[in-house]
């Protein structure tokens, strides 16, 4: 089903179901011989979803998830380290945008007094809360769920939940931007900047300028079509991931942040995976993804 500007979803459908795919990758990494991280809650979420009738992807889709598992693990590790480093500077307020099913508020070593705000669709956060409560999981920081769509007035919901914009904050934007229209992406970063005190940090998974080239998109679509045909031959249905994305020209994230007072550093997906000694496979080779870290050094009145 194609996306609309006001759609919503449960954990087992549309954008929500992608969180289960990422949880599969985290569960796989956690059980590997030399994991970059351990997320003992990933399998808990998968089991809870299965109890609701969800079935893990098999065939071509399952193969795709396994193929990008090293990328997903590297991404998780980068954001984990980003939060921990922010805590090392004394930042004790974190906001996870589109938090999905990653249990960072439960599994990371937060400094004393840290408040972690998680923003996502109401049904996603309810599933997460119910599952973790049933598992008797206790957060490692003060956890505050903020159930609101990021295309709505989430800043008001965040402040109403206790967020203090006068304190430095560490923000994460992971696995989110392609699910937002271009204008919504700009608005997201405008709001983050407005809510950030100087010294705040932001970590972003972004696409480079090469992602939206005709050449790359054509290669990607061909690969997806091949996988969907393989799934059909096996009698399985593989949804088209592009139906969930807004594929349109948008601002280059590092440039946008620098233009609005953020000091920025970047690393490509390939270089990040090399850092963690993870192989770049045919499914991840040439993936034009950037991991962007920013520090707000010039708070402006805009």
Model-assigned labels for residue ranges:
Residues 2-5, 214-302:
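Rossmann-like AdoMet/SAM-dependent catalytic core
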Residues 1-146, 165:
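Rossmann-like AdoMet
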Residues 170, 189, 194-210:
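Conserved beta-strand signature within the Rossmann-like core of class I S-adenosyl-L-methionine
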Residues 145, 153-156, 179-197:
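A short, conserved alpha-helix within the catalytic core of class I
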Residues 18, 155, 168-169, 181, ...:
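Cys-based phosphatases of the PTP/DUSP/CDC25 superfamily and their flanking regulatory architecture
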Residues 163-184:
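A short SAM/SAH-binding and catalytic strip from SAM-dependent methyltransferases
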Residues 151-152, 177-179, 208-212:
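Short, catalytically relevant binding-site loops at active-site mouths
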Residues 155-165:
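Short amphipathic alpha-helix with an adjacent loop that forms part of the alpha/beta core around
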